């Protein structure tokens, strides 16, 4: 019985160490090239858009949603019209950088964004549990509102 407890305890410690050194947990500086160059510095910084405008599930779901292209279309949709006949805004509609957004809006195919802050599949983390208790986005993600290109600035190890 004691031996079983030692083995289980050792397995738990091993799993914790594995998570603590897993590349996606400690990947400080991770800065993938996204399919659309998106400036959080402009959107969250200069324009003062709340994180939840795009990441709208962060306070009620386990995961902070990567926004659907329709969210981009609210401002960058151009001549497109929604199902309820609302015309979408036309901010920077001629920009070549937004071609994938326009294409996605027209075809209804998602943009393949690359997660910057990504935990291993075996780790359960609930964003809403932290956000609803007052943990700010900045605490884990850094000053994203000052980043032209988002990068991971802290380890995601929770420092146990």
Language-model features, listed with the residues they occupy:
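N-terminal start-of-chain detector that recognizes signal peptides
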Residues: 7-11, 22-26, 43-46, 94-99, ...
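Sequence context surrounding c-type heme c attachment/ligation sites in exported
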Residues: 22, 31-82, 123-160
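Aromatic-capped interface at the extracytoplasmic side
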Residues: 14-32
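A generic structural signal for short, solvent-exposed coil/turn residues
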Residues: 28-30, 43, 105, 117
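Hydrophobic membrane-insertion alpha-helices, especially the h-region
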Residues: 1-17
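Primarily the internal scaffold of c-type cytochrome electron-transfer domains
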Residues: 70, 79-123
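Short intrinsically disordered, low-complexity coil segments enriched in acidic
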Residues: 1-4, 62, 97
